[in-house]
Regions:
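Core AdoMet radical
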Residues: 61, 81-89, 106-120, 131-152, ...
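Short, electropositive alpha-helical surface patch
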Residues: 126-131, 219-237, 264-274
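Structural recognition of alpha->loop->beta junctions
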Residues: 156-169, 203, 230-246
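Generic structural signal for well-ordered alpha-helices
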Residues: 98, 124-127, 157, 192-195, ...
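Accessory C-terminal segments flanking Radical SAM cores
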Residues: 2, 226-227, 246-289
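Conserved alpha-helical substructure of the radical SAM core
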Residues: 24-114, 118-136, 143
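Hydrophobic, aromatic-enriched interface-forming segments
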Residues: 208-258
Length: 289
């Protein structure tokens, strides 16, 4: 990456905008936004609107964040991953997680995320061991697509296919301008190459390849079904790539995205937008309770 001009430009932008720590004044402004909003207490509101109090049920999804190192440094990242982050799950902790998985029959999905999970030292061992312990489990890899072009990852697509891993890939738009604006110059082209490589080994057909869209700014995503149709048309027509499903995600106002909103003076308006558009239908599927 030292000699990658595109990465250096992205890193420079993040040093100037996305990596600067919030000042005390900015932290106080964020706190005031929440207080002035006058939003109802969440648990009470959840009960009134959805008839749900957030009580947990049997665990079905075991989600593991196995490290924060990433070959990208996106300006919306909720966990502030970047090439400068080196926190990673140890082998001891990975073993404990695998033990929990082996002894939790209610768990049907192992959801592996990061950072770029594929670049973490324990990733492949966790995938292989999961397949041995629980061949019935759906293994999800939260992939940024450009990781497939990283040195040493030339066999990654084959590894994922051989182990029947369900790839959920982030692609915030079907145009190069919008993706590069959020993720850095050249990211869109490398993402398309990653999709093509996955298609070559069977993804988007017999192997599951889903895409995730999240907005580029302080607004809500469009209807999922309509956007999936547009993604399917644009990606197939212009790049010859296919996928299974598209999921739209609403950005959480935390970490780097919250900093971005705060510095643009949009945090209060965005919080109000989220409260106004609270969707009670999503409550039963809340992951973390």
């Amino acid at each position: 990456m030292k000699h990658d001009k595109d990465f250096q430009l992205t890193a420079k932008k993040l040093r100037e905008e996305g990596q600067r720590k919030l000042t005390l004044e900015e932290k106080q402004r964020r706190r005031r936004c929440l207080e002035e909003l006058g939003a109802p207490e969440f648990t009470e509101h959840l009960l009134q609107q959805a008839g749900c109090d957030g009580t947990r049920f049997a665990t079905e999804v075991l989600q593991l964040n196995i490290g924060l190192y990433c070959n990208q440094a996106c300006n919306h990242c909720h966990v502030e991953s970047s090439p400068r982050r080196h926190e990673a799950m140890s082998s001891d902790v990975a073993d404990k997680c695998l033990d929990i998985l082996a002894n939790s029959p209610s768990v049907t999905t192992l959801d592996i995320t990061g950072g770029a999970p594929e670049l973490q030292p324990e990733f492949r061992r966790i995938v292989r061991r999961c397949r041995e312990l629980r061949p019935d489990v759906d293994i999800i890899d939260r992939c940024n697509l450009t990781v497939l072009a990283e040195p040493g990852q030339e066999d990654l697509a084959d590894f994922l296919a051989d182990n029947g891993v369900h790839v959920v890939a982030s692609l915030p738009c079907y145009s190069d301008k919008n993706v590069n604006m959020q993720r850095g110059r050249g990211v869109f082209a490398r993402s398309i190459e990653g999709l093509r490589r996955l298609n070559e080994v069977g993804y988007g057909r017999e192997l599951k390849l889903d895409l995730v869209y999240n907005p580029l700014g302080a607004f809500l995503p469009p209807p999922q079904e309509a956007l999936q149709g547009k993604y399917t048309e644009e990606l197939q027509q212009h790049f010859g790539v296919s996928f299974n499903e598209l999921f739209t995600m609403t950005n959480m106002p935390i970490k780097r995205f919250a900093d971005f909103l705060s510095r643009r003076g949009e945090l209060g308006d965005y919080l109000e937008l989220l409260v106004r558009n609270f969707n009670a239908d999503t409550a039963p599927a809340l992951m973390c309770r």
